[in-house]
């Protein structure tokens, strides 16, 4: 908590600004370009930057993104929407990470082989119309994408439509979205629920069915503070 309180050459604001706008040149070259534009005469070495960066709490970027998102929706004069709601999408992907001991300890490897590459899961909630990332995270390789989606939905608001792919087929997640005040659209595999299988065999164009939580789903709901109740859904 005592970092960045003294008047150093590389203060908190300059460090954050540099990280956010760093280009593709060498680290030292980027430092020279940056300080030539913001504070002429200052000389910061790459090693000094590395030392300062280790002291920077990564949560600062989460706070900055949250503030930026709130500012955008509060002040933008021409926010694009679809009717009266935002169209949000959740998706995740596996990401190969740098191969060093600290990264492996934090995120794990692609498999149990000792020479397997470090792997993480990135996940995000994205406003597809306005092209704004509302929430994102990078997580260990064994993280549950469904749980990550649930945490992202905490950034959704009343009336939002959340779009999810076939990997997010769990009932407790649907309940969590609805109880946050948002709606959802999910591409379900046929074998996701028996009601979906029956609908697919019926040759009907659409149907309203009720999904009932199993004992396992009820426990998952309890763990996450979700009310485990039957859910009426429209299949098309």
Predicted features and spans:
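Single, function-defining residue in the core of a domain
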Residues: 1-25, 30, 41-43, 49-56, ...
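Residues within the helices of the helix-turn-helix
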Residues: 32, 36
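A glycine- and small-aliphatic-rich helix-loop capping segment at beta-alpha/alpha-beta transitions
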Residues: 106
């Amino acid at each position: 908590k005592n970092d960045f309180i003294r008047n150093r050459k590389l203060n908190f604001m300059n460090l954050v600004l540099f990280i956010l706008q760093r280009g593709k040149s060498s680290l030292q070259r980027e430092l020279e370009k940056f300080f030539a534009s913001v504070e002429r005469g200052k000389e910061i070495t790459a090693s000094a930057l590395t030392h300062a960066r280790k002291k920077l709490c990564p949560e600062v970027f989460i706070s900055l993104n949250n503030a930026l998102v709130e500012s955008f929706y509060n002040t933008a004069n021409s926010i694009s929407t679809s009717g009266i709601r935002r169209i949000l999408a959740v998706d995740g992907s596996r990401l190969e990470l740098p191969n060093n001991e600290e990264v492996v300890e934090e995120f794990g490897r692609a498999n149990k082989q000792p020479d397997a590459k470090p792997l993480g899961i990135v996940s995000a909630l994205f406003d597809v119309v306005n092209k704004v990332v509302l929430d994102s995270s990078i997580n260990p390789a064994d993280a549950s994408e469904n749980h990550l989606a649930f945490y992202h939905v905490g950034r959704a608001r009343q009336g939002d439509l959340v779009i999810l792919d076939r990997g997010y087929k769990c009932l407790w997640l649907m309940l969590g979205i609805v109880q946050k005040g948002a709606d959802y659209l999910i591409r379900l595999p046929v074998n996701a629920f028996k009601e979906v299988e029956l609908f697919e065999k019926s040759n009907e164009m659409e149907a309203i069915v009720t999904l009932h939580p199993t004992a396992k789903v009820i426990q998952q709901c309890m763990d996450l503070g979700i009310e485990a109740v039957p859910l009426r859904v429209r299949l098309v």
